[in-house]
Amino acid sequence: MAAAEPASSGQQAPAGQGQGQRPPPQPPQAQAPQPPPPPQLGGAGGGSSRHEKSLGLLTTKFVSLLQEAKDGVLDLKAAADTLAVRQKRRIYDITNVLEGIDLIEKKSKNSIQWKGVGAGCNTKEVIDRLRYLKAEIEDLELKERELDQQKLWLQQSIKNVMDDSINNRFSYVTHEDICNCFNGDTLLAIQAPSGTQLEVPIPEMGQNGQKKYQINLKSHSGPIHVLLINKESSSSKPVVFPVPPPDDLTQPSSQSLTPVTPQKSSMATQNLPEQHVSERSQALQQTSATDISSAGSISGDIIDELMSSDVFPLLRLSPTPADDYNFNLDDNEGVCDLFDVQILNY
């Protein structure tokens, strides 16, 4: 028999073996299991993860797009394409919530605008303006605290002065002090009980071009004392006489009035600078009925000037002791309504 030829396998027999022998068979090798392929993120060929599909993350990305948009205006179709959102209702859910909390507003059906940024608005300028306003508020609060502290100190100082028995006799204001505070003005010093109502109507223009002034005072608890204080120059002494003036001043006399002294001298109460204002006013009322020459209250120049005017500016409204009041005043009426008094022209 002829020997069989070895099959041509491309493998050469190892050295030392005959050509007619085959190599021993190899046992099959076990293959390791392959891990599953990782999921693809956001790709068209693979599904998205649960985290990528969450509404919170989608809202964060949407707000970022909205803040980066020009003038804060964002097109919803472009946003859906950028965020790769297949269901546009998720975008509408986000816009409905943001619109509900007043962060955005709809410009059109598919366009919204962020309210934090307007057309032509510079965010940096707004921030700088906000910082400036906050600094200004802090400065005003500091000044307010300083004023409150000064107010407390003044109130405590006044309390200390009023409570001190030694300082009580110095709690008065002289006529010179008042005139120095209101230099060049005619002053009316009013002593009235608590609750007195004071009303100054709007002045009317008179025929001679001057304004007509009125002052209405009403008290339900006691009398009202008014003093007229006048001072022509800084060197002269104040002239004080009661309002209304004494009876002898309101009645013109044929005899000429002669000045008592070359300079206008004050009343007798001016010699008591340490008395209270109320004490001086009571003394003025007690001495108002005395003679002009004995009181020395008003100089002849002032009397001549007052008497030469068309309407005597100081009128006695109090009735005589024999007469009595037979009239009433309504709540909207003043003192002038009780008497037939012409509006004074000063």
Swiss-Prot record:
<comment type="similarity">
    <text>Belongs to the E2F/DP family.</text>
</comment>
<dbReference type="GO" id="GO:0000785">
    <property type="term" value="C:chromatin"/>
</dbReference>
<dbReference type="GO" id="GO:0001650">
    <property type="term" value="C:fibrillar center"/>
</dbReference>
<feature type="region of interest" description="Disordered">
    <location>
        <begin position="1"/>
        <end position="52"/>
    </location>
</feature>
<protein>
    <recommendedName>
        <fullName>Transcription factor E2F5</fullName>
    </recommendedName>
</protein>
<dbReference type="GO" id="GO:0005730">
    <property type="term" value="C:nucleolus"/>
</dbReference>
<dbReference type="InterPro" id="IPR037241">
    <property type="entry name" value="E2F-DP_heterodim"/>
</dbReference>
<dbReference type="GO" id="GO:0006357">
    <property type="term" value="P:regulation of transcription by RNA polymerase II"/>
</dbReference>
<feature type="region of interest" description="RBL2 association">
    <location>
        <begin position="323"/>
        <end position="340"/>
    </location>
</feature>
<feature type="region of interest" description="Disordered">
    <location>
        <begin position="236"/>
        <end position="295"/>
    </location>
</feature>
<feature type="compositionally biased region" description="Polar residues">
    <location>
        <begin position="250"/>
        <end position="273"/>
    </location>
</feature>
<dbReference type="GO" id="GO:0003700">
    <property type="term" value="F:DNA-binding transcription factor activity"/>
</dbReference>
<dbReference type="GO" id="GO:0046983">
    <property type="term" value="F:protein dimerization activity"/>
</dbReference>
<dbReference type="GO" id="GO:0000981">
    <property type="term" value="F:DNA-binding transcription factor activity, RNA polymerase II-specific"/>
</dbReference>
<comment type="function">
    <text>Transcriptional activator that binds to E2F sites, these sites are present in the promoter of many genes whose products are involved in cell proliferation. May mediate growth factor-initiated signal transduction. It is likely involved in the early responses of resting cells to growth factor stimulation. Specifically required for multiciliate cell differentiation: together with MCIDAS and E2F5, binds and activate genes required for centriole biogenesis.</text>
</comment>
<keyword id="KW-0010">Activator</keyword>
<keyword id="KW-0238">DNA-binding</keyword>
<comment type="subunit">
    <text>Component of the DRTF1/E2F transcription factor complex. Binds cooperatively with DP-1 to E2F sites. Interaction with retinoblastoma protein RB1 or proteins RBL1 and RBL2 inhibits the E2F transactivation domain. Component of the DREAM complex (also named LINC complex) at least composed of E2F4, E2F5, LIN9, LIN37, LIN52, LIN54, MYBL1, MYBL2, RBL1, RBL2, RBBP4, TFDP1 and TFDP2. The complex exists in quiescent cells where it represses cell cycle-dependent genes. It dissociates in S phase when LIN9, LIN37, LIN52 and LIN54 form a subcomplex that binds to MYBL2.</text>
</comment>
<dbReference type="InterPro" id="IPR003316">
    <property type="entry name" value="E2F_WHTH_DNA-bd_dom"/>
</dbReference>
<dbReference type="InterPro" id="IPR036388">
    <property type="entry name" value="WH-like_DNA-bd_sf"/>
</dbReference>
<feature type="short sequence motif" description="DEF box">
    <location>
        <begin position="81"/>
        <end position="118"/>
    </location>
</feature>
<dbReference type="GO" id="GO:0000978">
    <property type="term" value="F:RNA polymerase II cis-regulatory region sequence-specific DNA binding"/>
</dbReference>
<dbReference type="InterPro" id="IPR036390">
    <property type="entry name" value="WH_DNA-bd_sf"/>
</dbReference>
<dbReference type="GO" id="GO:0001216">
    <property type="term" value="F:DNA-binding transcription activator activity"/>
</dbReference>
<dbReference type="InterPro" id="IPR032198">
    <property type="entry name" value="E2F_CC-MB"/>
</dbReference>
<dbReference type="GO" id="GO:0030030">
    <property type="term" value="P:cell projection organization"/>
</dbReference>
<dbReference type="InterPro" id="IPR015633">
    <property type="entry name" value="E2F"/>
</dbReference>
<feature type="compositionally biased region" description="Pro residues">
    <location>
        <begin position="22"/>
        <end position="40"/>
    </location>
</feature>
<feature type="compositionally biased region" description="Low complexity">
    <location>
        <begin position="1"/>
        <end position="16"/>
    </location>
</feature>
<keyword id="KW-0804">Transcription</keyword>
<dbReference type="GO" id="GO:0090575">
    <property type="term" value="C:RNA polymerase II transcription regulator complex"/>
</dbReference>
<dbReference type="Pfam" id="PF16421">
    <property type="entry name" value="E2F_CC-MB"/>
</dbReference>
<dbReference type="GO" id="GO:0009887">
    <property type="term" value="P:animal organ morphogenesis"/>
</dbReference>
<dbReference type="Pfam" id="PF02319">
    <property type="entry name" value="E2F_TDP"/>
</dbReference>
<feature type="DNA-binding region">
    <location>
        <begin position="47"/>
        <end position="118"/>
    </location>
</feature>
<dbReference type="GO" id="GO:0005654">
    <property type="term" value="C:nucleoplasm"/>
</dbReference>
<keyword id="KW-0970">Cilium biogenesis/degradation</keyword>
<keyword id="KW-0539">Nucleus</keyword>
<feature type="region of interest" description="Leucine-zipper">
    <location>
        <begin position="76"/>
        <end position="98"/>
    </location>
</feature>
<dbReference type="GO" id="GO:0005737">
    <property type="term" value="C:cytoplasm"/>
</dbReference>
<keyword id="KW-0805">Transcription regulation</keyword>
<feature type="region of interest" description="Dimerization">
    <location>
        <begin position="119"/>
        <end position="215"/>
    </location>
</feature>
